[in-house]
Amino acid sequence: MILSDWDIRVYIEKKLLIIDPLFDDTVRENGVDLRFGDEFCRFKRENSVVDTSRDGVDNVLECYRVRGDGFVINPLEHVLTTTLEYVEFPHDLVGLVNLRSTFARFGLYIPPTVIDAGFKGNITIELVGSTVPVKVYPGQRFLHLILARTSSPVYKPYTGKYQGQRGVTPPKLDNSSSKNF
């Protein structure tokens, strides 16, 4: 069941759902709006191949702290960004992340993203550029997070490799290799 603004406020008031900072316009009719943080990472323009079975991306990402001047997302560029807000999900809520329609109308896109029950941290989002450069700014509301209650609290809440992340978190490889299946 998707939570209404009333239900969301109850979760927040009871400190079952943490959103920090929480602004007056965060809670919406059927979800919460989250803002750009001040960190953006783009992939360097290189011809080297990133091997997802063994390579990290530290050597192919350029990360920036952005202030009032904003950040330009180039045409069809893939960037990583983060939410300003730190969130903590209870064991009976999941989040369905959507780009706010204003940013979609500029041609930006995010892939489907789910926030698992029990997740704690800033949310790192993959953002794909439009056909024209688009400038965005820290503090702008850019995501709409729909909250859905599970039929019961999950047996195994999220404890994965992105638990507790702060700021942009690049991909982390699994310990097991897909080459050995």
From Swiss-Prot:
GO terms for molecular function: dCTP deaminase activity; nucleotide binding. Its EC number is 3.5.4.13. Pathway: Pyrimidine metabolism; dUMP biosynthesis; dUMP from dCTP (dUTP route): step 1/2. It is an enzyme of class 3 (hydrolase). Homotrimer. NCBIfam families: dCTP_deam. This is dCTP deaminase. It comes from Desulfurococcus amylolyticus (strain DSM 18924 / JCM 16383 / VKM B-2413 / 1221n). The gene is dcd.
